[in-house]
Amino acid sequence: MGPYLSQPKTEKSTVTGQNQVFQYAATHMQGWRNTMEDAHISDMNIEPDVHLFAVFDGHGGSEVAIFAERHFREELMKNKNYQQKNYEKALTETFFKIDKMLQEPSGQDELNKIRGVNDETSLAGCTANVALIVGKTLYVANAGDSRSFLNRDGKPFDMSKDHKPDDDQEKKRIERAGGFVSDGRANGNLSLSRALGDLEYKKDSRFKPEEQIISALPDVKVTQLTASDKFLLMGCDGVFETWDHQQILNFVNQELKSSQNLQKATEKLLDQLLAKDTSLGTGCDNMTCILVLFK
């Protein structure tokens, strides 16, 4: 059996919310894939004026993405740097904490329960694109190839960059750790170079966690939100295969002008991005999109 269904699953699950500062919609759709491996967080007011959104795109299974969805908020809020308002450092440390939890027996037990198996080591992983809004400051921590961008004065302002094995910096780390890059893939397998999980690439005790073949180290980008920022859009890589950021921005703008309904906007966007068939391979992935509209 190949990776695709004979017909796409186009049913969508959407959650919405709003407060005095923004409203949001988070939508996911399985699409052509045999399984749904995405997970996400949409959590307003984890504290007064602090909000958390995240996209986790799983590979090799859904269990690591689901684990991150379950635990990221709690681990972030327990972090001492978070409590001291050192948010950049707190986000980075939480990525590594989740990765460490995955390696512990209790973490493996939970992964096995998610998968419905016993006594196996999970080889799955996931991207993590995490947005923390604190007042008027936006922090985005990213590991992998899920993305976030702002609509800033009608133009996309990227809040993350993809981590790919053939990028010079990534390739050097992979090779220093004893790995190799072939056909744009780490060890000829993974098409991204940073992720949560993927524990088989993180076993060498000679190297720090950030030095392993696959690293959980996120890039963290920070910006101050102003009146020129209309919305934040986050998504797994399946959202960005068909259209570029400007095309997505224009489509969302047009939908919001006509309906002011975020759920309609995100659901129609995924319909537009879904491939008609699987012949080209693009537009065939699971899709998760979070739209945060600032008031």
UniProtKB/Swiss-Prot annotation:
It is a peripheral membrane protein. Residues 151-170 are annotated as: Disordered. GO terms for cellular component: membrane. It comes from Paramecium tetraurelia. It comes from the Eukaryota. It catalyses: O-phospho-L-seryl-[protein] + H2O = L-seryl-[protein] + phosphate; O-phospho-L-threonyl-[protein] + H2O = L-threonyl-[protein] + phosphate. It is an enzyme of class 3 (hydrolase). Gene3D superfamilies: PPM-type phosphatase domain. Mn(2+) 2 binds at residues 57, 237, 285. Residues 23-294 form the PPM-type phosphatase domain. Keywords: Hydrolase, Magnesium, Manganese, Membrane, Metal-binding, Protein phosphatase. This is Probable protein phosphatase 2C 5. Its EC number is 3.1.3.16. Binds 2 magnesium or manganese ions per subunit. Its cofactor is Mg(2+); Mn(2+). Its main location: membrane. Enzyme with a broad specificity. One of its GO terms (biological process) is signal transduction. Mn(2+) 1 binds at residues 57-58. GO terms for molecular function: metal ion binding; protein serine/threonine phosphatase activity. Belongs to the PP2C family.
